[in-house]
């Protein structure tokens, strides 16, 4: 893409004046409805031995090869304590249109309503996958830098490395790597804490011994004979 021929580097706000800083250990990426980009980072590479789960927001259209985070949300204390390299592996933004009345909100003990969160960033919910236990955690990221955990979903596949929301089937895909035979879980929100989960084995031809850690769904228009 134009201006991305050599890629762009994302940096923590604290490193804005220190271009030599190692920066975030970015593991996942998502884009909201306004085109802002969010990175999931499981540690600060300047302190590699410490787990530090954060989501960083950047404007991909900003000039320069370095993008300083416009906003940062630290999720570490709201997640299970894990080793440095077993933190969040993915982030997925889902519009409130797709989760209102469907996602269970543990704070209200009822179906989620974005109106209860007037400071919500990007009019949606951000889901992160934790490698250590395969759980998916949903958050509202507030525009003041705070965050609220909405729900905790166990994908029951052991580990989680990738997320992608299918807007056609209205399901959240959670995908594992070779440590769990590249199995996936399709999660459908039904307004209760007991979500609908369907497990999917890796398709034939996929090398389940390979360290596959990314996953994305094409639009339904790409389907052949399906």
Residue spans for each PLM region:
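Sequence/structural signature of beta-propeller domains
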Residues: 1-226
């Amino acid at each position: 893409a134009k201006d991305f021929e050599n890629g762009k580097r994302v940096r923590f706000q604290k490193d804005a004046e220190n271009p030599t800083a190692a920066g975030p250990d970015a593991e996942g990426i998502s884009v909201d409805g306004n085109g802002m980009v969010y990175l999931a980072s499981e540690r600060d590479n300047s302190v590699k031995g410490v787990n530090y789960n954060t989501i960083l927001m950047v404007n991909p259209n900003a000039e320069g090869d370095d993008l300083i985070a416009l906003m940062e949300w630290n999720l570490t204390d709201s997640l299970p304590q894990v080793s440095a390299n077993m933190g969040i592996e993915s982030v997925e933004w889902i519009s409130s249109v797709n989760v209102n009345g469907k996602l269970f909100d543990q704070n209200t003990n009822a179906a989620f309503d974005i109106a209860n969160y007037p400071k919500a960033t990007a009019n949606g919910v951000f889901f992160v996958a934790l490698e250590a236990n395969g759980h998916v955690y949903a958050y509202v990221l507030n525009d003041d830098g705070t965050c609220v955990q909405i729900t905790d979903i166990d994908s029951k596949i052991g580990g989680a490395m990738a997320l992608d929301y299918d807007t056609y089937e209205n399901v959240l895909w959670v995908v594992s790597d070779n440590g769990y035979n590249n199995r996936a879980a399709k999660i459908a929100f039904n307004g209760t804490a007991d979500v609908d989960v369907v497990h999917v084995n890796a398709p034939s031809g996929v090398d389940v011994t390979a360290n596959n850690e990314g996953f994305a769904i094409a639009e339904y228009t790409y389907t052949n004979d399906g």
